[in-house]
């Protein structure tokens, strides 16, 4: 019987933890084999603040995904997010010993390793070194220098930095939940892979991923990551505003936001009222949808304006840096009614909602194609793309060993030849090694 491979993406968010099991089908699409969800109780604004609760939530999501798929989860691809993440631009160069030899992968590795040695602020660690453009002997705008001749190799890098303690806590939760660490990605980059097309990345696009605890931004131009940022506000702060503004409990505030919430107050009439049941026999509380929308609008405007400042800081106003493809909204917060129209009004940029369905097989559940699961699908795609992280299919639950003797007599299949690692695989391994040793 032909061995089947599958991979797992684990999205550790502020409001939910999602485990998605999938594999690549013969058409290059992702086939979803199982999904598990759990309420996230130990994460605040993308950062673990309760180890025990986070471990329990991870185990619950993993167990549910195993039951749903009938498969055993061993290794997971995870994301890094949170307000501790920051990014910077850096240029560096190396002088090659022999300019008569063509530039090889080792030369690019040496240049990247040099960037990893940069001294950061106390308690910070470089977690991503992403090349943007290379120069060879002064010749600029080179995307791939390998195979060229030259003595001086330069590059511009987008460097992502994280807080060591925050990263260690995620690693500890993964390992304490009985899992191995596979692919590691900055979450907005994972979401971008799931919802953006290559054409959008080439034309210039800003991905805004509105999660429960944070709003993440990733800007692409000419197919290259140009800017990343984390805004420390997400859907949860909107819920908190509704809770305080309407004097109701958090659960009621969240339901109000989902069912009746709108980012555009003008859409609601003054006489539209919703009644909220009172607590322990108290009288019901009446709330006008107009007032509800005003509360939501005020916070959403604040978030969008902060994101727009980041977009302008990148240089969107410059003709050369213009984001022709506009803005793509994703994440659970992107489902807020009239948010798209408000973003277009504030920024003046074309905006669409990003769904991770383009890369999914046609028979995938409709639920998984929601913007809510963009990061999880992106993390799964990263795991699937790395052959080294594939795991053989095996039952999740205990089974009888009747086939044990029979299987011993079957002819061993030859192990497939490992593909040659490119520089991106090596950078991922470097980050993985750092996280594995972070305890």
Place the predicted regions along the sequence by residue:
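A short acidic Gly-Thr/Ser loop motif
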Residues: 10-16, 80-81, 207-214, 220-223, ...
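Residue-level signature of catalytic and energy-coupling elements of molecular machines
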Residues: 10, 19, 78, 174, ...
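Short beta-alpha connecting loops at secondary-structure transitions
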Residues: 226-227, 240, 288-293, 325, ...
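Nucleotide/phosphate-binding catalytic cleft detector across ATP-hydrolyzing
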Residues: 1-14, 20-76, 80-207, 235, ...
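Short, solvent-exposed amphipathic alpha-helical segments in soluble enzyme
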Residues: 25, 200, 342-348
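Glycine-rich phosphate-binding/hydrolytic loop that grips phosphoryl groups
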Residues: 355-400
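Phosphate/pyrophosphate-binding loops at sites that engage ATP/ADP/AMP, CoA/4′-phosphopantetheine
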Residues: 62-74, 304-325
């Amino acid at each position: 019987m032909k061995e089947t491979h599958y991979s797992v993406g684990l999205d550790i968010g502020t409001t939910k933890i999602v485990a998605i099991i999938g594999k690549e089908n013969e058409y290059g699409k992702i086939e979803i084999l199982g999904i598990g969800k759990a309420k996230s109780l130990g994460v605040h604004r993308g950062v673990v603040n309760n180890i025990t609760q986070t471990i329990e939530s991870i185990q619950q999501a993993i167990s549910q995904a195993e039951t749903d798929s009938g498969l055993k989860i061993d290794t997971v691809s995870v994301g890094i997010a949170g307000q501790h993440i920051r990014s910077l631009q850096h240029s560096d160069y190396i002088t090659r010993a022999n300019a008569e030899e063509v530039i090889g992968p080792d030369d690019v590795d040496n240049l990247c390793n040099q960037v990893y040695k940069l001294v950061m602020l106390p308690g910070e660690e470089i977690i991503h070194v992403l090349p943007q453009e290379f120069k060879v002997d002064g010749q600029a705008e080179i995307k791939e220098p390998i195979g060229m001749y030259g003595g001086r190799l330069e590059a511009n890098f987008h460097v992502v930095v994280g807080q060591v303690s925050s990263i260690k806590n995620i690693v500890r939760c993964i390992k304490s939940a009985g899992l191995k660490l596979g692919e590691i990605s900055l979450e907005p980059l994972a979401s971008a892979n799931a919802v953006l097309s290559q054409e959008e990345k080439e034309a210039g696009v800003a991905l805004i991923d509105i999660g429960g605890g944070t709003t993440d931004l990733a800007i692409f131009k000419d197919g290259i990551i140009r800017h990343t940022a984390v805004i420390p506000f997400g859907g949860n702060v909107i819920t908190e505003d509704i809770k305080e503004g309407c004097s109701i409990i958090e659960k009621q505030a969240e339901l109000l936001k989902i069912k009746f919430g709108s980012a555009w107050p003008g859409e609601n009439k003054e006489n539209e009222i919703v009644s909220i049941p009172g607590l322990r026999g108290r009288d019901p509380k009446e709330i006008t949808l107009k007032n509800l929308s005003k509360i939501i609008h005020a916070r959403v405007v604040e978030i969008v304006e902060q994101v727009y400042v980041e977009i302008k800081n990148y240089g969107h106003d410059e003709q050369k840096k213009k984001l022709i493809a506009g803005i793509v909204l994703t994440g659970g917060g992107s489902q807020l009614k009239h948010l798209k129209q408000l973003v277009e009004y504030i920024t003046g940029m074309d905006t669409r909602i990003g769904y991770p369905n383009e890369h999914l097989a046609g028979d995938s559940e409709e639920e998984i194609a929601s913007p809510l699961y963009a990061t999880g699908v992106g993390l799964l795609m990263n795991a699937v793309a790395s052959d080294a992280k594939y795991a053989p299919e095996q039952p999740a639950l205990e089974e009888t060993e009747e086939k044990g003797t029979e299987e011993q007599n079957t002819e061993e299949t030859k192990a497939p030849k490992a593909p040659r690692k490119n520089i991106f695989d090596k950078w991922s391994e470097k980050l993985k090694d750092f996280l594995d040793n972070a305890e």
